């Protein structure tokens, strides 16, 4: 699996890159602004983004700000021309669907992806929440698709009636089996309630429809996308995004996701293990004086 680092902090990018583990970077405008604002020595955003592109030889995903296809294409060309010459590694993040409500156009992202790829500008279809969205982005020619694991998990948990901050924290891990047990229990409660009123309502209850949805978790979305892409030989690569803990990284790697884009704190979590620390303590105790002498010669 390739590892991208999901950050705008140049010091984190440089540190992780020095370990030889970074294959690319994903970021967004708000993260970049925070990183620039936190610097003691003030530099322009343009100079800062150029520094990110220079630091990493792999792809660097940069985002557009508009919602219309025409505007996104113009912004993408501008960003690409501004930064790609630095290290020939710029990828443009395009939301797969830019609509913010039901009465807005749903296809602007797909349109922009197609046009940009035809112009030779690589795209990363972002905010992917379903296998269908990933399939359409791949058909349009996207270089990458980014399913958002953490956000999908949050959505599923809330639909099950769990409350953020009370029943789960942002970084907490729920495996599919645990989620399935919760789902079954919730369905039982609703069916019991509906039977008392009218058994026929079971078939139209929106809560039951939501709980019977085919998607089990964010990792499950990656699994389904992977299967579709393999079936139809799509060249589009899968970037598992919105990763919040080390377990998710392990699971998407097991599935065969092409890339996991990981925040720095999760990378730190990946390298830690209590038994490794314990082993190091024992190891240092076991070093005998005769062995230490070898290092003094």
Residue ranges and their predicted role:
Residues 5, 9-13, 19-21, 27-109, ...:
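Active-site beta->alpha loop and helix N-cap motifs at the rims of alpha/beta catalytic domains
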Residues 263-269:
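A hydrophobic, small-residue-rich beta->alpha segment in the mid-to-C-terminal subdomain
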Residues 21-22, 57, 142, 257:
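A structural motif
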Residues 100, 104-114, 122-263, 276-287:
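Catalytic alpha/beta core domains of metabolic enzymes, predominantly
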Residues 24-25, 92, 145, 260:
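Hydrophobic residues within beta-strands of alpha/beta enzymes
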Residues 32-36, 156, 270-271:
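A short acidic, helix-capping loop that chelates divalent metal ions and anchors anionic groups
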Residues 1-3:
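Extreme N-terminal starter segment of soluble prokaryotic enzymes
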């Amino acid at each position: 699996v390739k590892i991208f680092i999901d950050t705008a902090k140049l010091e984190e990018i440089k540190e992780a890159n020095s370990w030889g583990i970074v294959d690319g970077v994903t970021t967004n405008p708000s993260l970049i602004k925070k990183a620039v604002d936190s610097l003691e020595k003030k530099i322009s955003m343009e100079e800062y983004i150029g520094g990110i592109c220079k630091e990493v030889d792999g792809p660097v995903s940069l985002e557009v700000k508009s919602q219309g296809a025409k505007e996104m294409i113009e912004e993408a060309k501008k960003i690409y021309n501004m930064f790609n010459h630095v290290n020939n590694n710029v990828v443009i993040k395009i939301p797969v669907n830019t609509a913010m409500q039901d009465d807005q156009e749903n296809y602007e992202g797909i349109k922009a992806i197609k046009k940009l790829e035809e112009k030779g500008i690589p795209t990363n279809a972002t905010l992917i929440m379903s296998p269908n969205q990933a399939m359409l982005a791949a058909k349009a020619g996207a270089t990458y698709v980014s399913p958002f694991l953490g956000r999908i998990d949050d959505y599923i948990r809330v639909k099950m009636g769990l409350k953020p901050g009370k029943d789960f924290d942002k970084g907490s891990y729920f495996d599919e089996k645990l989620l399935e047990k919760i789902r079954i229990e919730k369905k039982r409660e609703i069916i019991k309630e509906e039977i008392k009123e009218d058994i026929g309502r079971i078939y139209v209850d929106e809560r039951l429809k939501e709980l019977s949805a085919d998607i089990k978790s964010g990792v499950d979305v990656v699994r389904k996308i992977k299967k579709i892409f393999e079936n139809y030989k799509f060249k589009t690569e899968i970037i598992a995004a919105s990763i919040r803990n080390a377990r998710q990284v392990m699971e998407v790697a097991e599935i065969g996701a092409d890339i996991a884009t990981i925040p720095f704190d999760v990378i730190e979590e990946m390298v830690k293990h209590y038994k490794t620390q314990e082993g190091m303590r024992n190891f240092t105790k076991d070093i005998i004086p005769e062995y230490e002498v070898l290092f003094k010669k």
